[in-house]
């Protein structure tokens, strides 16, 4: 088993070998101005919000609104996700990422697609590669009723019954629960933006039929952690992210002009706003730049659920959020168009939504019948 295989200028990331190497391939070394360096990172003060049945609704709405106005990140507890399911989801993640590289590559992600196994971003980019492996798959809330391939069927098809069946059972339940929680949070977000009364269910209904993404992240230990990143600085292009971290820290958020850490808290889920919801809120709430760092002693794992609308649903803010003082900031678009942009044309960063809007306006000008 070799550390790096060079085939047509493409690097293969083998975590089982690379994690013990004192030198790392140059493709994983980030520029000094972007790498973590040796500066100590302080912890970010993040709201810890009880969203349980007994929580006072007005307090939850207020805390969520304040968090989104500050930096877009908050923690939720008493969220209704059973601890046993979270633990089993992490066990299944361990089972997958400890498979031999060849077994994991049975689910290899194809160019231009958002689902499958990815060992770093090899094949997509040639520099500033992230120090991680991922397994991503689609979750459709309407999958069962429309006969679409579900999470379980996808994982069995890609990994075979031996490895895929148990993962499929666990992550089908996990995604269902994440979708449920996402819809509850969407209703809270709407209320915090002033969408109340008969319209308070607006965002819940918008995402009721969602076409979301589930991602398992594995960040191996690295003997040069100050020179690389587990995930580079970016804003999520999706609508809402719900993250469960293991006990190893690594998530950092750009807030108050510097990088700040969000430490893991047992039982808590990390929630943040993405670019698509930023557009839906007419930029009242903004997606926040964040990254993941690695360390030299312990691997880090996380489970990320990315709430997304159905592919061809038009993303535009509700009428309550557009007025003379708040004119439209972004053009109408579909999630399919934004997803395709990030997979084929643009590497997600802090400017993704603006770059996409500029690209969309340019192409609509050139070919209005196609992009209108």
Swiss-Prot record:
Keywords: Iron, Metal-binding, Oxidoreductase. Residues 209-309 form the Fe2OG dioxygenase domain. This is Gibberellin 20 oxidase 1. Belongs to the iron/ascorbate-dependent oxidoreductase family. GA20OX subfamily. InterPro entries: DIOX_N, IPNS-like_FE2OG_OXY, IPNS-like_sf, Iron_ascorbate_oxido_reductase, Oxoglu/Fe-dep_dioxygenase_dom. GO terms for molecular function: gibberellin 20-oxidase activity; metal ion binding. It catalyses: gibberellin A12 + 2 2-oxoglutarate + 3 O2 + H(+) = gibberellin A9 + 2 succinate + 3 CO2 + 2 H2O; gibberellin A53 + 2 2-oxoglutarate + 3 O2 + H(+) = gibberellin A20 + 2 succinate + 3 CO2 + 2 H2O. The keyword Transmembrane does not apply. Its cofactor is Fe(2+); L-ascorbate. Disulfide bonds: none annotated. Induction: Negatively controlled by the level of physiologically active gibberellin. Plants over-expressing GA20OX1 have high levels of bioactive gibberellins, and exhibit an overgrowth phenotype with increased internode elongation and leaf sheath length. Plant silencing GA20OX1 exhibit a semi-dwarf phenotype. It is an enzyme of class 1 (oxidoreductase). Fe cation binds at residues 234, 236, 290. Its EC number is 1.14.11.-. Key oxidase enzyme in the biosynthesis of gibberellin. Gene3D superfamilies: B-lactam Antibiotic, Isopenicillin N Synthase, Chain (2.60.120.330). GO terms for biological process: flower development; gibberellin biosynthetic process; gibberellin metabolic process; response to light stimulus; unidimensional cell growth. The active site is at 300. The keyword DNA repair does not apply. Binds 1 Fe(2+) ion per subunit. Preferentially expressed in reproductive organs. Expressed in the epithelium of embryos and the tapetum of anthers. Expressed at low levels in the shoot apical meristem. It comes from the Eukaryota. Pfam families: 2OG-FeII_Oxy, DIOX_N.
């Amino acid at each position: 088993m070799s550390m790096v295989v060079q085939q047509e200028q493409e690097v293969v990331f083998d975590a089982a070998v690379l994690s013990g190497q004192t030198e790392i391939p140059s493709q994983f070394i980030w520029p000094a101005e972007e790498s973590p360096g040796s500066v100590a990172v302080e912890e970010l003060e993040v709201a810890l919000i009880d969203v349980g049945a007994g929580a006072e609704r007005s307090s939850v709405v207020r805390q969520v609104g304040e968090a989104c106005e500050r930096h877009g990140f908050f923690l939720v507890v008493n969220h209704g996700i059973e601890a046993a399911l979270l633990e089993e989801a992490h066990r299944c993640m361990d089972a997958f990422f400890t498979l031999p590289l060849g077994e994991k590559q049975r689910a290899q992600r194809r160019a231009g697609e958002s689902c499958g196994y990815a060992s770093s971003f090899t094949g997509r980019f040639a520099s500033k590669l992230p120090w991680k492996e991922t397994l991503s798959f689609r979750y459709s809330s309407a999958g069962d009723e429309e006969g679409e391939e579900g999470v379980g069927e996808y994982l069995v098809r890609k990994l075979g019954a031996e490895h895929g069946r148990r993962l499929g059972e666990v992550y089908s339940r996990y995604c269902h629960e994440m979708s449920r929680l996402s819809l509850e949070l969407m209703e809270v977000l709407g209320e915090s933006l002033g969408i109340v009364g008969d319209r308070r269910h607006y965002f819940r209904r918008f995402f009721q039929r969602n076409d979301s993404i589930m991602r398992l992240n594995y960040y191996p230990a690295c003997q040069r952690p100050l020179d690389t990143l587990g995930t580079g600085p970016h804003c999520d292009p999706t609508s809402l992210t719900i993250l469960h971290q293991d006990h190893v820290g690594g998530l950092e958020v750009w807030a108050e002009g510097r990088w700040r850490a969000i430490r893991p808290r047992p039982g808590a889920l990390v929630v943040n706003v993405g670019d698509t919801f930023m557009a839906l809120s007419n930029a009242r709430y903004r997606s926040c730049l964040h990254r993941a760092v690695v360390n030299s002693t312990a691997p880090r794992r996380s489970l990320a659920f990315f709430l997304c609308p159905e592919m061809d649903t038009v993303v535009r803010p509700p009428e309550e959020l557009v007025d003379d003082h708040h004119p439209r900031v972004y053009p109408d678009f579909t999630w399919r168009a934004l997803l395709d942009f990030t997979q084929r044309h643009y590497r997600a960063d802090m400017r993704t939504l603006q770059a996409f809007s500029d690209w969309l306006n340019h192409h609509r000008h050139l070919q209005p019948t196609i992009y209108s």
